[in-house]
Amino acid sequence: KDSKVTVTCLKNSNKDDSPAFTFTDYPNTIFIGNDSVRNGKFSFTFTVPKDISYSNLQGKMNLYAVDTESGNEAQGNFDNFIVGGTSDTSETDTIGPEIRALYLNDTTFVDGGQVNTTPYFVAELWDKSGVNITGSSVGHDMMLVIDESTVLSYNLNSYYELLPGEDGTGIVKFPIPALEPGKHTAEFWVWDILNNSTVRTFTFEVVEGLKPFLFDVIATPGIAR
């Protein structure tokens, strides 16, 4: 997580003159990853995004682990590090993330295909520098925009996860809220940590009463954040 910031609530109630409630939090993510623990040790390597706060203040790591055999869980956090500075060696990456697969519900989906009213969006991504999910810079969020509507625009930063053991490869999965029957157009925007972008446009038709085929059900423990 990037360094702590002060968040001010909207104060929707105007019944009194009291100030809006404020609190501190770590809302901006630098990196999310997972790996196996070997002999009690694990490690991550990643490139810090351009879109950090450069505050030179403490960040925060949230850690979670589970023993797949016993089911025992462990969690904790670490904040003895500073977020800031710029590397002396700059990256030369000028290419946006590669969208290796994009579909609704399952991999048999084709552009213009029929789906149910609540389709499941999936995109498989790769980028040599890393995908940007910081949420700290305007216009660099991972977004799904349907019918060019602000009401049907969804920030997918928190739905992205890296695939273990595959550098730069990740997947985003998002259950789209109920849509009106008929034809729709969607744009999927994704940025890398050096602010190169990729956009994919696709179409689909929502058919009321159509049900997706269930291939498998897998339950996994929640990740501490």
Which residue stretches match the model-derived regions?
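Conserved catalytic region of serine esterases and O-acyltransferases that act on ester linkages
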Residues: 1
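Long, low-complexity serine/threonine/glycine- and acidic-rich segments characteristic of extracellular
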Residues: 6-85, 101-104, 108, 122-208
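Intrinsic-disorder/low-complexity coil detector
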Residues: 48, 96, 118, 174-176, ...
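Extracellular interdomain linker/stem segments of modular secreted and single-pass surface proteins
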Residues: 83-96, 206-214
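Surface-exposed, proline-anchored Ser/Thr-rich loop/turn motifs
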Residues: 99-106, 114, 209-225
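Short, solvent-exposed beta-strand/turn "edge" segments of beta-rich domains on protein surfaces
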Residues: 110-118
